[in-house]
A protein has these predicted regions:
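Alpha-helical scaffold domains
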Residues: 3-263
Length: 263
């Protein structure tokens, strides 16, 4: 199988500067290569920072590469090489390579303590909603982490001044901590966020747009699971009006909540 051969080639050269762009290129969507309208739409949806190159792969192919790399005996060397590349030059790696690094961390078979340790140097690399959300939504290992341990791990990121570190904490909480016992704690954390202190590099959007949308998404998801509690919280909360409007919009857009009154 071509993809396995490509991954083996990468693993043999892991100690060099070569990363996996060359191995990803054969799996670029033909439509991305051949249809300008499709290519522009793909790039627009991902909305990476201008300096971040996008190759044009779909998520299933990216996940397949990551799973194969995670099975390599030298996978920790692979992750270390990714870390060195990101540290050497922020935008050297493509959007897809950046996501592969996170999905390898997700796919590893290791104790949760070790996984959190591997995750720490990756979180500062997040600078795009698609990388952040694809990582978080595929981090099923988080279900096996004691909830209080996961919550403590997320605390520094809730307090971060960087947009996607905060969004990371929001989406992880949405995916793995929206449980009855944690609902009030998560809701309280939303009110504690000071949006005025969070820096965004997306200067063409209401800053920090992707944190506001993360808050709205979390609340809309909570509405689907705990409608009465969520409505009560939103009504009484000190959340900004724009976050409340985004929440109502997300609720209307979701098939799970489009018939549920958001307030």
């Amino acid at each position: 199988m071509q993809i396995s051969h490509s991954i083996d080639t990468f693993a043999r050269h892991i100690q060099t500067d070569i990363m996996i762009e060359k191995q990803l290129i054969p799996h670029i969507s033909p439509r991305f290569l051949n249809e300008e309208k499709y290519r522009r739409g793909h790039i627009r949806i991902i909305n990476a920072l201008p300096e971040r190159k996008i190759l044009g792969l779909h998520l299933p192919e990216i996940k397949q590469v990551a799973k194969q790399l995670a099975k390599q005996t030298d996978v920790l060397d692979i992750l270390h090489a990714f870390e060195q590349e990101h540290q050497a030059e922020r935008f050297r790696l493509t959007y897809e390579e950046t996501l592969v690094r996170g999905l390898i961390i997700n796919a590893l078979k290791c104790p949760w303590e070790e996984r959190l340790s591997l995750l720490k140097p990756y979180i500062p690399v997040l600078d795009n909603w698609a990388v952040c959300d694809s990582f978080c939504c595929n981090a099923k290992w988080a279900l096996k982490v004691p909830a209080n341990e996961l919550w403590q791990f997320l605390q520094p990121y809730f307090k971060s001044k960087r947009e996607f570190e905060v969004r990371f904490a929001l989406v992880m909480s949405m995916c793995y901590l929206l449980k009855e016992a944690w609902l009030d704690i998560v809701f309280h954390q939303l009110e504690e966020l000071d949006l005025s202190t969070i820096h965004s590099e997306y200067t063409n959007l209401t800053s920090p747009y992707y944190v506001r949308m993360g808050m709205a998404w979390l609340l809309a998801t909570a509405l689907a699971k705990y409608p009465d509690e969520t409505r009560s919280f939103v009504k009484a909360s000190s959340l900004t009006e724009d976050v409340k409007r985004l929440y109502a919009r997300k609720a209307r857009e979701s098939f799970r909540t489009r018939q549920v009154v958001p307030y």
